Amino acid sequence: MIHYVTPDLCDAYPELVQVVEPMFSNFGGRDSFGGEIVTIKCFEDNSLVKEQADQPGAGKVLVVDGGGSLRRALLGDMIAEKAAKNGWEGLVIYGCVRDVDVLAQTDLGVQALAPHPMKTDKRGIGDLNVVVTFASVTFRPGEYVYADNNGVIVSPSPLKMPE
């Protein structure tokens, strides 16, 4: 597993990276993560998050545009454990998570807005692999996202940590 340091990536690739507004906190067991973007757009319904966690995710990060809702958690321990088991590098969630003590022990990167104890309704509503924009950055499927305790950045191409 590669350890990413977003300040070093910003210094090495200033013309490539976009910095996501600093509103996210680390809830996962990995201090840093990065990979190819897979997007989901959903609102208070994590059906697609659950479906994608069941898919192979090596080298990929699930970017979830939850509309910034602070009323429901889009990720909990069971989905996070499935995502980790299926090789996902992490998730960036414009929304909330729950079971935060378990998430902190799970081998998965998780950046989200806040904890919230209430689960979502599963109605099967949402869009997969669409362009999403939040926190002043546009996330496109197939581009790359990197995250650590300093922040979240996006690049159109993969970045290597400087020597």
Curated annotation (Swiss-Prot):
Sequence positions that bind a divalent metal cation: D99
Enzyme Commission number(s) of this protein: 4.1.3.17, 4.1.1.112
Entry's Gene Ontology molecular function annotations: 4-hydroxy-4-methyl-2-oxoglutarate aldolase activity; metal ion binding; oxaloacetate decarboxylase activity; ribonuclease inhibitor activity
Keywords: Lyase, Metal-binding
A Pfam family: RraA-like
The record's free-text note on cofactor binding: Divalent metal cation.
Disulfide bridge positions per record: none
SUPFAM superfamilies hit by this protein: RraA-like
Family membership noted in the UniProt record: Belongs to the class II aldolase/RraA-like family.
Record protein name field: Putative 4-hydroxy-4-methyl-2-oxoglutarate aldolase
